[in-house]
Regions:
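A structure-centric signal for secondary-structure junctions around beta-strands
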Residues: 30-33, 99, 129, 193
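N-terminal export signals
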Residues: 5-24
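The catalytic-center signature of Zn2+-dependent metalloproteases
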Residues: 140-206
Length: 206
């Protein structure tokens, strides 16, 4: 794998927002076109929710790719899960016109190296300013009080990771969905589930 900067999402963004998605607008048109790439079986209704959330919050266009089998090269036998950075390596060649970014989505557990731990389970991983990111719904379900909250975590994690590919870093505003969860569910439970004004401005969103 070539040298790239990855940003890790160590916990989900889990609070149901009191307000509906506010549709993002840019005078120049969509900031990116995201290829939504299922890795293994993935419910179509989940894809619908993810697409709607990405379009609404980030103002991106979305194209859907057919499902792909998870690559054997990403499998980590000692923990029986998939390495997120290797999944991104697999996904990156899927960025072909009109797509400018790719988001892989899977229901299986994923991991990366973090906090001095070789194999640390994560919700998602994104290339900062790069082409690819991947999320898993596996941890979205952990300690979730409802299916609705599980789905909200899934969608906001997707927005978070695509945000990293668009150049956003972790945000100091703890209410912003780009905040660094640091692995603490109670931290993400306090987020609004939306981008703050500063992060929206960085993307040129109204």
């Amino acid at each position: 794998m070539d040298r790239r900067t990855f940003v890790r999402s160590l916990a989900g963004l889990s609070v149901l927002s009191a307000a509906p998605w506010a549709f993002a607008q840019r005078p120049e048109g969509p900031i990116a076109t995201v290829a939504l790439a299922p890795l293994g079986p993935f419910p179509p209704s989940f894809l619908d929710e993810i697409e709607a959330g990405l379009r609404a919050e980030l103002g991106v266009a979305v194209v859907r790719l057919p499902p792909s089998a998870l690559p054997r090269a990403a499998w980590y036998p000692p923990r029986r899960r998939y390495r997120a950075e290797r999944l991104i390596d697999f996904l990156r060649p899927m960025v072909r016109p009109p797509a400018t970014r790719v988001l892989g989505v899977t229901q299986l557990d994923i991991s990366t190296t973090a906090h001095g731990v070789h194999d640390w389970g994560v919700l998602g991983l994104g290339e900062h300013g790069g082409l690819g990111c991947v999320i898993s719904t596996f941890r979205c379900r952990m300690n979730s009080p409802s299916e609705a909250q599980t789905h909200f975590r899934m969608v906001t994690t997707c927005i978070h990771e695509i945000g990293h590919t668009l150049g956003l870093e972790h945000c100091p505003d703890t209410a912003c969905l780009m905040t660094d969860a640091r692995g603490l569910v109670r931290t993400v439970d306090r987020t609004s589930g939306h981008l703050c004004a500063r992060c929206r401005a960085r993307l040129g969103l109204r």
